Amino acid sequence: MRLLPILLLLALPVHAVEPSLQVLSYHDVKDYVAGDYDPDQYAVSTGNLIAQFTFLRDNGFHPVSVDDVIAAYDGRRPLPANAVLLTFDDGMESFYTRVYPLLKLFKYPAVISVVTSWIESDVVLEYAGKKRVSADFLTWDQLRE
């Protein structure tokens, strides 16, 4: 008889938590970053990005596309549990050489945001404390691919 209250509690419906969306935002990816951590606040090492992608895969996270997010917002289909939107800002050249191959390998969708005036231009700008030129950013051909 003492088990009855416990059994009744276990029989109560559990309120489902609506799927949420986590957003991971990246800027630059470098092949090598000295030390055990990434001291450049705007960059992650290629090795750490692989470790993060592996963590997502091995721990039940589901990278989603912008179309998935819009469809969920419009009520057409829900997001999966543990939805993650991967974003890469500023259109750094490393997106093409380091990130894009990893996205294909893991079969992960992603969003890339570019500053079009930085692409194939003569502009020299300061970015993350360094002078940057157009070669540091994606080209139009790379973006089309």
Where are these regions (language model features)?
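Sec-dependent N-terminal signal peptides
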Residues: 3-14
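Short polar catalytic/cofactor-binding loops
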Residues: 26-31
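Short intrinsically disordered, low-complexity coil segments enriched in acidic
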Residues: 2-3, 145
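Active-site beta->alpha N-cap acidic-glycine motif
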Residues: 18-21, 33-145
